[in-house]
Design a protein with these regions (language model features):
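Glycine-rich phosphate/pyrophosphate-binding loop and the adjoining helix
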Residues: 3, 169-197
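Hydrophobic/small residue at the entry helix of a nucleotide-binding pocket
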Residues: 32
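Short pre-catalytic strand/loop immediately N-terminal to key active-site residues, enriched for Gly-Thr
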Residues: 23-28, 113-115, 191-195
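Single conserved hydrophobic/aromatic residue that forms the stacking wall/gate
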Residues: 1-7, 12
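Glycine-rich phosphate/dinucleotide-binding loop and adjoining beta-alpha-beta core of small-molecule
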Residues: 35, 41, 46-173, 183-185
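Flexible, glycine-rich phosphate/dinucleotide-binding loops
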Residues: 15-16, 56, 146, 191
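Short linear Ser/Thr-Pro motifs
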Residues: 5, 28-29
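Glycine-rich N-terminal loop/short-helix segment of MobA-like nucleotidyltransferase
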Residues: 13-27, 102-109
Length: 197
């Protein structure tokens, strides 16, 4: 979600449509985004929430403005409009790739289908590299291997102030779960473990 004055947050997955019926997306329920919003409300933040397709119930408050952004391109456009904030939290499960050639008609079933993908805009990196970047930026990373080194590389590449690292624990992939597992990494390389909560 992105917030307009005191804090800002970006949340929830998008869809990159192949045709009017089919799409590619990332796994995400939206529970984490709503938990962040609830926490920000307790601290009296005014919030603009940029979101894709939700599987969780919205929190209704006069301090929250919801903006539907169905894909990475539209989410980046809205993020740029709302970048002059004190705090921006980028926890959206944005698809890294979109479809090169969208079909306006439903693609008929074949024995095989080859899709040409194109790289989507990097929202976090674009906003953090902007001259009108938020005062504080927090990115998110979900890693499955070499988690700390990959997270450190992402923090440096994206140029955000903090990175929330999530990774699977035991047999729990964390997705669609009431729990998260991981910690917080800052630009100095300091890591605070949160664990499974």
């Amino acid at each position: 979600c992105i917030r307009d004055s005191v804090g800002s947050e970006m949340c929830i997955r998008d869809r990159e449509y192949i045709d009017p019926v089919r799409y590619i997306s990332n796994e995400s329920s939206g529970q984490q985004g709503m938990a962040l919003i609830k926490s920000l409300l307790k601290k009296n933040y005014r919030i603009v929430c940029l979101h894709g397709y939700l599987q969780t119930k919205l929190i209704i408050s006069p301090k929250i403005k919801y903006v539907f952004t169905p894909n990475a391109k539209s989410m980046l456009a809205e993020a740029k409009k709302n970048s002059k904030v004190d705090l921006a939290i980028f926890n959206a499960a944005v698809a890294d790739y979109g479809i090169q050639n969208y079909s306006k008609q439903k693609i008929k079933k074949k024995s095989a289908l080859n899709l040409q993908l194109k790289k989507n805009p990097d929202i976090l990196k674009t906003i953090c590299s902007s001259k009108q970047k938020p005062k504080t930026t927090i990115g998110f990373a979900y890693e499955t291997n070499d988690v700390f080194n990959n997270a450190k590389k992402k923090l440096k590449t994206k140029k955000c102030d903090y990175l929330i690292l999530n990774f699977p624990v035991d047999s729990d992939p964390i997705f669609n779960s009431k729990y998260n597992n991981g910690g917080i990494l800052n630009i100095k390389g300091d890591y605070i473990e949160i664990g499974k909560k």
